[in-house]
């Protein structure tokens, strides 16, 4: 963040729990973090939580002092600019339509703005990653759009929020609604998780907002409608295993094409 001149604040993070089952998950999560070299992780009680951030919900928590917050919008732009400075090129409004394997093992990628010759293809197309895989001759990927809604709280609420507060992870290692202060002084509360109607389903619903208020109140004690200034929705891809129906967030693998 410093190198890219992106606002960053070292806040730490609380991953909170309410039940014995949550405590067991946090213990497992903490062991995994320590195995991965994360320093300073602690399981703390409510008294210690109040010292760190009395606005946080939960009966106990895993404290992660190395965590922080930054501006995700400026960070994304900075990464794009840095890539250009290092030789990357962007071809906008350029849809990938197919691929032809060359005799030397390289690939000719066909797009709506001409062909591109390459040795490697990195599929990071998100919601359209299954379409890209299909064009490359790799079937079997099914992507379902999952919608998540957020509330943006006024900076009057931000004065109470010192630290990002997340719930104990679910058994599949996903997280539900959390409360995160921003570098600008607001608070983001969300997301929820809904199966979207399609890849463009950005509509906010009253039922979802009511549910978000309830779940957000468990994370942030100052969740009050008087602080609400904006709500929005985003779509994230979930890969569905056709054989088992299992949901996967990320798939990292290397495949031969053709």
Model-flagged regions — what are they?
Residues 1-52, 58, 174-177:
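Dinucleotide-binding Rossmann-like beta1-alpha1 core, especially the glycine-rich loop
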Residues 16, 98-99, 179-180, 252:
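A structural signal for short hydrophobic beta-strand segments in well-ordered beta-sheet cores
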Residues 21-25, 52-59, 100-107, 241-246:
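A short, glycine/Asx- and small/polar-enriched loop/turn
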Residues 41-44, 89-91, 229:
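General small-molecule cofactor/ligand-binding pocket signal
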Residues 63-120:
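Helical element adjacent to the flavin cofactor pocket in flavoenzyme catalytic cores
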Residues 72, 78, 174, 183-184, ...:
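C-terminal catalytic lobe of FAD-dependent flavoproteins
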Residues 115-161, 205-206, 223:
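Central helical "cap/lid" subdomain
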Residues 149, 155-185, 206, 218-219:
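Mid-domain catalytic core of redox enzymes
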